[in-house]
Amino acid sequence: MRKRKNTRKYIKYIVVIICFVITILLMFVFKRNILNYNGLNKINIKEIFNNQNDKVIKAKYEKEKKPKIYSGNSRNVAVMVSNEKAAWPQAGLLNAYMIYECIIEGGETRFMALYKADNLPEKIGPVRSSRHYYLDYAAEHDPIYAHFGWSDLAMQRIKQRGVQNINGIYDKYYYREGGGYNNAFVSKNSILDFAKQKGYPLTTNKEFPLKLSGRNVDIEGENICNNLKLTYSQKHNVTYKYDAENKVYLRSMRGINHVDRVTKEQIKAKNIVVLKVKNFNLNDYVGSPRQDLNNIGSGEGYYITNGKYTKVTWNKSQYNQNTVIKDLNGKEIVLNDGLTFMQIVPDKYDVEIY
């Protein structure tokens, strides 16, 4: 009887020990799983946080990325540049942030090149005289306005509007190379020195007149533009050929590559804005009649960038108001960071896109 009791006692001890060992083992396994689970969660949470943080930083960077072509508070400067064939090739156009091309007398065109004062090239020209309708576009930029002479209407508007100008006829800040009419040039230092002498501000808070993005924004849709031809007159036409590798348009005039006089580099446009405007003759000049434009009002056109185009409408309510350009859905166009050519073309000619 006593022996049986001892056996039961031993069994009881063994069961207790086994239970204790099992409990210890279970605790060890459970603790290890908890640690592993927490460790995995820590890694996952850290990875998720880092990924989300990267996305937020990238999105913020993309949102805040500012265009280089028009940055800072440096004053805008407009220079009237000849585009008669005798003036080719011109100097300094590659530094411009925007260039307007409009029809003038004799079926020729003239450029108004716009720069930031801190990005003026050493040589700009040949510089020619002002025409009154360019001043309506210049008002959108509030620039120091450099020209060599003026038409009667341009003279009136410059004086009436108080345009801060540099006129080569009276202001000896230009220099000549060679003979003829297309031989006047102006330098960066001459413009800045004259501005300081006259007390013209060299800083501005003037915003870019159109929407401008620091990112590369493509036009929606499938309207491809690899080649563009614009006709200004029987004498003058402009063509662009798309360079898909660099996402720019290479510029030519009358079948000849448009190059810079100094660098010999072909002129490249990131954006091309075509505005169709009615032009007509004025009777204020003996010889080839000077032109006028119906550029205050509204019309149609095209916007071309990155190998695509969209039809647009334009509206300019008065001379000192910006030209508002919208696509056919009513959204204002967004220009990409780079040189923009504003092609103000006679509306009687077709725009060829292919």
Predicted features and spans:
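Hydrophobic membrane-insertion alpha-helices, especially the h-region
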Residues: 14-29
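A surface/extracellular/periplasmic glyco- and lipid-processing/surface-interacting theme
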Residues: 2, 38-100, 105-354
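Functionally constrained cores in energy, signaling, and assembly domains
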Residues: 12, 31, 98
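Intrinsically disordered, low-complexity segments enriched in polar/charged small residues
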Residues: 9, 17, 36-37
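Alpha-helical structural elements
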Residues: 5-8, 32, 56
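Hydrophobic single-pass membrane-insertion segments
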Residues: 25-42
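N-terminal Lys/Arg-rich, disordered targeting/topogenic segments
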Residues: 1-13
